[in-house]
Amino acid sequence: MPQKDLLETIIEQVRPLLGKGKVADYIPALAEVDPTKLGIAVTTIDGQTIGAGDYLEPFSIQSISKVFSLTVALTLYEEAEIWSRVGKEPSGQSFNSLVQIELERGVPRNPFINAGALIIADLLQSRLGAPKHRMLEVVRKLSANPHVIYDKRVAASEYEHSARNAAIAYLMKSFGNFNNDVDRVLRNYFHYCALKMSCADLSKAMLYLANRGQSLSAEQVVSPIQTRKLNALLATSGLYDGAGEFAYRVGMPGKSGVGGGIIAVIPGDMSICVWSPELDKNGNSLAGTAALEKLSQALGRSIF
């Protein structure tokens, strides 16, 4: 377990990076976030959580929600059903690319780009009567926080600027790889992205990825083998087009979101979340990545 003073030191070491990135501005509600926010939290497999900086302040988790969506899908479907609809390869394209969908006949490269996450949302819609309710239930349970909510203003803001995601969904539908009403699936998807959670919430919620599929409450969320596979996907595809850079610098499976959060996992040991809203050119938190790199170096830990 890292000590709290180590986390506080790391926060101060990366603070000079604030002002060098850019807050996501294509979602108006996200553009208003204070760019100086900076937090880190760690939860160990024995259930302890420590943090530093703004680690208790909720933020919009955005694409980090794709980990929860895929996890829920794995509890509802045989794996072969999921992987017949979406691939497992890094994309090498922007996270909202239409070109790749056209070239690969409606099958997205992986579940962590927008197209792949929309397929997962479509799968959830097919099996769940109230997907939004189920997702909130799952996340509250995993984080041990019954007060986690959807930020309805962020969800509405994303829906109002949803033309590209709608285009992706309709293009996949034209190839026969989308089964439900596009508008309904989009509304659910934007709600998942609009979950508001703190670094502490997320480090707790993602503990199952570090603990062979067991959550903070010792529930078996997914099997140990599924957990290993999830971590493999996170290591190769979790950081948009910056996955290689992240693996090189940080050396952990991870997932980022344009809200400035990044979750990372040291299997068998701990789950981590950092938050700093300013992003680098790949859409990943600039100071957050640096904080994870420093933590990895300080602990001498990497999966490689």
UniProtKB/Swiss-Prot annotation:
Gene3D superfamilies linked: DD-peptidase/beta-lactamase superfamily
EC number: 3.5.1.2
Pfam families, per the entry: Glutaminase
Annotated keywords: Hydrolase
Substrates-to-products reaction catalysed: L-glutamine + H2O = L-glutamate + NH4(+)
Keyword Cell membrane attributed: no
One annotated GO biological process: glutamine catabolic process
Superkingdom of origin organism: Bacteria
Key word Hydrolase present: yes
Binding sites annotated in the UniProt record for substrate: S63, N114, E158, N165, Y189, Y240, V258
Gene Ontology MF, one: glutaminase activity
Residue ranges crossing the lipid bilayer per the database entry: none
Subunit structure: Homotetramer.
Family as reported in the entry's similarity comment: Belongs to the glutaminase family.
Entry protein name: Glutaminase
